[in-house]
Structure formats: C-alpha cells, structure tokens
Curated annotation (Swiss-Prot):
Protein name (record): Ribonuclease Z
Role, per record: Zinc phosphodiesterase, which displays some tRNA 3'-processing endonuclease activity. Probably involved in tRNA maturation, by removing a 3'-trailer from precursor tRNA.
CDD domains for the chain: RNaseZ_ZiPD-like_MBL-fold
Taxonomy of the source species: Bacteria, Bacillati, Bacillota, Bacilli, Lactobacillales
Organism of provenance: Lacticaseibacillus paracasei (strain ATCC 334 / BCRC 17002 / CCUG 31169 / CIP 107868 / KCTC 3260 / NRRL B-441)
Keywords carried by this UniProt record: Endonuclease, Hydrolase, Metal-binding, Nuclease, tRNA processing, Zinc
Enzyme class name: hydrolase
Length: 320
C-alpha cells in the first residue's frame, strides 16, 4: 500500500505544485489504484509516474470545486483512448455525475468501459468488500466536502508450520485446509481443528484522506487511530482567522487533530503558492512542535504504508 501525490497545491497550479489529486496504490492488495480527486492536469501528472490509467478502478471525489475535479473528464477520456476496458466507479457528492456526463456529451467523448456513479449523501459506507471498507462523513467547507476513511480488513494469520510438523501431520492438501481454519480428519483417524494451527490475524492498515475543510468535530472519528492522515494546510500557524473565514485549515490545526486522533503520521497537502521552500519548512517545523510525525508532501512523492508489525520509527517511510 502506497500513496503517491499527483497534486499538492491549493486553488490554482503553480510551477512546483499542481492542483489536488493523489493515488492510493493497492497493487499488491487488489491489483488496483484508487484516485482521490482529479484537479486540472491530473492525467499529465500521471504520465510522470509508473501508474497505468487502466489500473485505476475507483475515483473518490471529496468535493466539487474546480481544483479537485476539472481534470476528471480528460482523464476518463484518455483512459478510454489508451484501450482501457475495465469498469470504473466514481464516488462523490451530488452533481459529480452531471458534471462528468455533460463534459463527455458536449465533447462527444465515448468511453470504451462501463462507468458507474455512487452519489454520496448520508454519512456511512461508500464501499465495502472482503478486503477493504471505505466510510465517509461531511466536513466543514463552503460546499459539501467529504473526508474518507479507508480501512484494510485484518489478514488471516499464517499457518504455524512448526506446530503442524510437531503434530506429525503429513504435508499435502491438508495444509491448505488447516490454514483455512477447517477441521480435518487424517487417514489414521486423528482429527485436527485448523484454528489451532493458525497464528494471530495481522491488523489491516487505515488511511484517512480529507477534502478541503476547516476544523470540525466530524473529522475526529474519521481520523481516529489511522496509520496516515492526509490533511489540508492552506494556511500557516498565525492565520487561524483567515482559515475560518475561507473554510480551510492551518497547519497547526491539522497537527492538533492528528495528535488528538492518535494517528501514526500526518501528511500535509493543499499548500498555497504563497509558501515557497522556506515557507514550507516553516509549516512543517511549526506543525511538528505539536505533532512530531508530520511531513509536508510535494508532487510525485510516494509514501509507503507498512503493516504495523513491520513499522519502526518513523511509522511511514517517505520516498521522493
């Protein structure tokens, strides 16, 4: 599981940061990539990465401001032009379906794959299967803006092979049955419960990805205990009144939430073009005074999210 940031800027693109988009890469877990937001130029950013558009199976839209959606129709059309045939599902607020369908209709773009929309209204579960669960709630922005909580379900424990051998259970298909937790009967009449030969389940990982928001109580349960929290940082530490006025957050407000929620690592994005390198360093430094495991991300940066049993300090490794 990895997050790759495709756009980390706020409002408008700059020379160093494109507008909002990130990819949650689940290639080992599902052979898929999930896209969160698709600001203008997202497909250009994807070209600079190893991400294959046909691998993108889901797109989650936090809200309908242009810097989060203007790149979506172009990406969808290019995915089709590049031979994509696998279905794609878009999750987002009411209005996203009209926006996409109107854009495709006016431009006479025809997709080569099925496109499904899941319109998110009442807080709850956006998606769930045997391996992942995605929940959402409304945050506090000028328009409807969502935060998403992506939870990987626990992985079954490993077969305790030494214990199996100590019981003198012959190798073969019976091992698979034991690992599946089944009760097996051997030719010699001995009966074994597979659960007795399975180690503890491995906890899954949790990532919280927020759209634009100012501080609100609904953010806490979405972020609680997450391995990684991705949170906007449009304003600096001394601009809380501006943040409130414009429905955004400061870096130190995000850090306070991360501390309160007990997350593993805080990743700050949605960085204003007003902050050049010295300013970005200041955002990171002042946030770390509240929550030490904070990092201000940049475009194309990749964040690996290991299982908790594999983690050492820091909890998440950063590659650029």
């Amino acid at each position: 599981m990895e997050i790759q940031f495709l756009g980390t800027g706020a409002g408008s693109p700059s020379k160093s940061r494109n507008v909002s988009s990130l990819a949650l890469k689940l290639l080992d877990e599902r052979n898929e990539v999930w896209l969160f937001d698709a600001g203008e130029g997202t497909q250009h950013q994807i070209l600079q990465t190893a991400i294959r558009p046909r691998k993108i199976a889901k797109v989650f839209i936090t809200h309908l401001h242009g810097d989060h959606i203007f790149g979506l129709p172009g990406f969808l059309a290019s995915r089709s032009n590049q031979g994509g045939t696998d279905p794609l599902t878009i999750y987002g607020p009411s209005g996203i379906e009209d926006f996409v369908k109107t854009s495709l209709k006016v431009s006479q773009s025809h997709l080569s794959y099925p496109l499904k929309f899941v319109l998110l209204q009442h807080p709850g579960v956006a998606f769930e299967d045997q391996t992942f669960k995605v929940t959402f709630d409304r945050l506090d922005h000028r328009i409807t803006s969502f935060g998403f909580r992506i939870e990987e379900k626990p992985h079954p424990g490993e077969l305790l092979i030494d214990k199996v051998r100590a019981a003198k259970i012959p190798s073969g298909p019976v091992y698979a049955a034991l690992k599946a937790g089944e009760t097996v009967t051997l030719p010699d009449g001995r009966i074994f419960d597979g659960h007795d030969f399975i180690g503890p389940a491995q906890p899954g990982r949790t990532v919280a990805i927020f759209g634009d928001t100012r501080m609100c109580n609904r953010a806490l349960p979405l972020a609680a205990g997450a391995d990684v929290l991705v949170h906007e940082s449009t304003f600096g530490p001394d601009e809380s009144q501006l943040a409130k006025q414009y429905y955004h957050a400061t870096n130190v407000q995000a850090a306070a939430l991360a501390k309160r929620a007990g997350v593993g690592r805080l990743l700050l994005n949605h960085i204003s073009a007003r902050y050049l390198s010295p300013g970005v360093a200041m955002l990171e430094k002042t946030a770390r005074q509240i929550f030490p495991n904070t990092h201000v991300v940049k475009d194309f940066e990749e964040i690996n999210i290991p299982f908790r049993s594999e983690q050492s300090e820091p909890a998440v490794t950063v590659k650029s």
